[in-house]
Regions:
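Short beta-strand-to-turn element immediately C-terminal to the catalytic PLP-Schiff-base lysine
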Residues: 2, 53-57, 68, 76, ...
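Gly/Ser/Thr-rich phosphate-binding loop
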Residues: 3-59, 64-66
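Hydrophobic/anchoring residues in structured secondary elements
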Residues: 20, 152, 200-201
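Conserved ATP/PPi-binding loop(s) of AMP-dependent carboxylate-activating enzymes
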Residues: 59, 68-96, 112, 127-132
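AMP-binding/adenylate-forming catalytic core of the ANL superfamily
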Residues: 77, 104-194, 204, 217
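Flexible lysine-rich "adenylation lid" loop at the C-terminal edge of ANL adenylation domains
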Residues: 196, 202-222
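A short, polar/charged loop-to-alpha-helix boundary motif
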Residues: 222-228
């Protein structure tokens, strides 16, 4: 929202950097910030790691990163908590010196590379034997000129297990794009498996307290509706 306010944009541009976290930032927002002269640094971390410990994909000194089988991110090192006072099962601290997160990611060049956070494991969509993460699909949809905001989620499907569904907010003055147009747009950069099979146009996306899209609310809203 600050990028739509000239005074706020100018104030942010005077800072050394603006730290963002909580999930992957949409490319249009990053591009708009860069065009306004705002230095944006993407942070990654959680309470168990004493907050942010990876900045623009690069871990702080003393922080270790691994990507486990299945793609989950594991974090170790000096900033890591010893564990939970009341451990849960399975315990993400079970491996000594490491915390197994619920996030999926990739390291560019082995365990010493730059980390890319792909999304949450519990948000992955299993469709036709393939796994689709919402965030890369949202990033692709967000580059369509008619899409101002979007969210991707999975709905139960008798044939596929789950189908990929998109909810979009249309940009001011733009005609709503068709499902076919958005599928073709996504397929330019991702496998066609990731392209949405169902489209909903909404006025606003539901969000939780800290601003994250509430995918569960979208699932509840659109479950059982026919394809559009």
């Amino acid at each position: 929202k600050a990028l739509t306010d000239p005074a706020a944009t100018a104030a942010l541009a005077e800072l050394d950097a603006v730290l963002i976290g909580g999930g992957p930032a949409p490319r249009p927002i990053l591009d708009a910030a860069a065009a306004a002269g705002i230095t944006v640094v993407r942070t990654y971390g959680m309470s168990e790691t004493s907050g942010g410990c990876v900045y623009d994909g690069v871990p702080l000194d003393g922080v270790r990163l691994r990507v486990l089988a299945g793609g989950r991110i594991a974090i170790g090192g000096a900033t890591l908590a010893k564990g939970y006072r009341n451990p849960v099962s399975p315990d993400p601290f079970a491996e000594p010196g490491w915390f197994h997160t619920d996030d999926l990611g990739a390291l560019e060049s082995g365990d010493s590379g730059v980390l890319t956070v792909l999304g949450r494991a519990d948000e992955a969509i299993s469709t036709g034997g393939f796994t689709v993460l919402p965030q890369p699909v949202e990033a692709a949809l967000g580059t369509h000129p008619a899409v101002r905001d979007c969210a991707v989620f999975g709905l139960a499907d008798d044939r596929l297990g789950q189908r990929v569904v998109a909810a979009i907010v249309v940009g001011d003055g733009c005609p709503p794009p068709t499902l076919e147009a958005l599928r073709a747009h996504v397929a330019r950069t991702l496998d066609v498996t990731a392209a949405p099979r169902e489209l909903h146009v909404v006025n606003v996306l539901p969000r939780r307290g800290i601003g994250k899209v509430d995918r569960a609310a979208l699932v509840r809203r659109f479950a059982g509706e026919a394809d559009q």
